[in-house]
A protein has these predicted regions:
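N-terminal binding-site loop/beta-alpha segment at the start of enzyme catalytic domains
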Residues: 1-84, 144, 335, 339
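Generic structural signal for well-ordered alpha-helices
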Residues: 44, 67, 71-74, 106-110, ...
Length: 339
């Protein structure tokens, strides 16, 4: 396993993060494709065997049962607390990112994970209903209380992250050290502003959906899997751009064939070639962990990276929330992204 540092926090993380959205109690109308406690334990055990020490989840994943399954698995495997970097998120709950909600939700998360502190606490989205100062101060209080080691953010506009960092700096509060953004070969909009802002603040990039919800894992668009047929969020995120994205999928398949590896390994290797610290991979089987880890040994040439990126076209923004009552910001019309 290869390791790096979580931004300016000094926390050592594996170059792969195990995502917890695949874990938890399946529920109709939400995540019907998640796996149970026994399967969760098997996936986590395999990840740990490979040296993956970074696990991400959220209070909203499967209504908290993702956190429960992860906590149960780590206890049953007798994993020392200092050997894992646990991250969870807050926002999709009553009260959003208000001080009261943050204070309440961290206690629930810690209880479900079976720990007395989090290594990384991430705000899942930007909260328009709560003053930024209130949110940042509440998060800083958790750090000072020893309940959280570092802070992260996810899926927002770059100007919002910049404002949050400015508030933290001006008040001497804890700054954010990581950004969990939507980033893959089919969606590269954050190269325009978010990623440069993160580099300015010495933040780690830990993208979600590095495999575009499976679209970068197979040469065809459709999937007969439970997730492929029930996940409306995935459909809304990618299907509207199928026409412009499918040629990129075909190029991933071509590069994978030339290397004799699964397409997923090419898609992941591209992230590291781009300087990304730790893409988050969701795995429903131990073998999927094996495939992801093998991608660390795949090196793409500059010519291959250019080949994979050449056909990218601008996309509507996916992830950040627009201000309530206002039309969401559109994507850019600048076609060419350069390395």
């Amino acid at each position: 396993m290869h390791y790096t540092t979580l931004g300016h926090s000094g926390i050592k993380i594996s170059r792969l993060c195990l995502g917890g959205m695949s874990f938890g109690e399946a529920s109709p109308g939400f995540h019907q494709w998640t796996i149970g406690p026994r399967e969760t334990r098997a996936v986590i055990e395999r990840a740990l065997e490979h040296g993956i020490n970074f696990i991400d989840t959220a209070n909203s994943y499967s209504f908290g049962t993702s956190e429960e399954y992860i906590g149960d698995a780590l206890r049953s495997l007798s994993v020392a607390r200092e050997d894992v970097v646990l991250a969870s998120k807050v926002h999709f709950n009553e009260g959003g990112l208000s001080a009261a909600a943050i204070k309440r939700e961290i206690e629930g998360t810690l209880k479900r994970l079976g720990t007395d502190y989090l290594d990384l606490y991430i705000i899942h989205r930007f909260d328009y209903d709560t003053p930024m100062e209130e949110t940042v101060k509440a998060l800083d209080d958790l750090v000072r209380a020893g309940k959280v080691r570092a802070l992260g953010a996810s899926a927002m506009y770059a100007y919002q992250l910049h404002n949050l960092q400015d508030i933290a700096r001006e008040n001497g509060w804890t700054e954010f050290t990581s950004m969990q953004c939507h980033y893959n070969l089919l969606y590269r909009e954050d190269e325009r502003e978010m990623i440069p802002v993160c580099r300015q603040f010495d933040m780690a990039i830990t993208p979600y959906s590095p495999l575009a919800s499976g679209h970068l894992c197979r040469p065809t668009w459709e999937s007969a899997s439970t997730r492929g047929t029930t996940d409306k969020t995935m459909v809304n995120k990618y299907d509207r751009d199928r026409t412009i994205d499918m040629p990129i999928v075909e190029r991933v398949a071509k590069v994978a064939e030339e290397h004799g590896v699964p397409m997923s390994q090419v898609a992941l290797a591209w992230h590291w070639a781009r300087g990304i610290e730790a893409p988050i991979v969701g795995c429903s089987k131990p073998e999927r962990v094996d495939d992801a880890v093998a991608a660390l040994d795949l090196e793409l040439s500059d010519a291959e990276i250019d080949f994979l990126e050449e056909l990218y076209q601008p996309h509507a923004l996916v992830g950040p929330k627009g201000r309530p009552g206002e039309k969401e910001l559109a994507g850019t019309t600048n076609v060419k992204l350069t390395r």
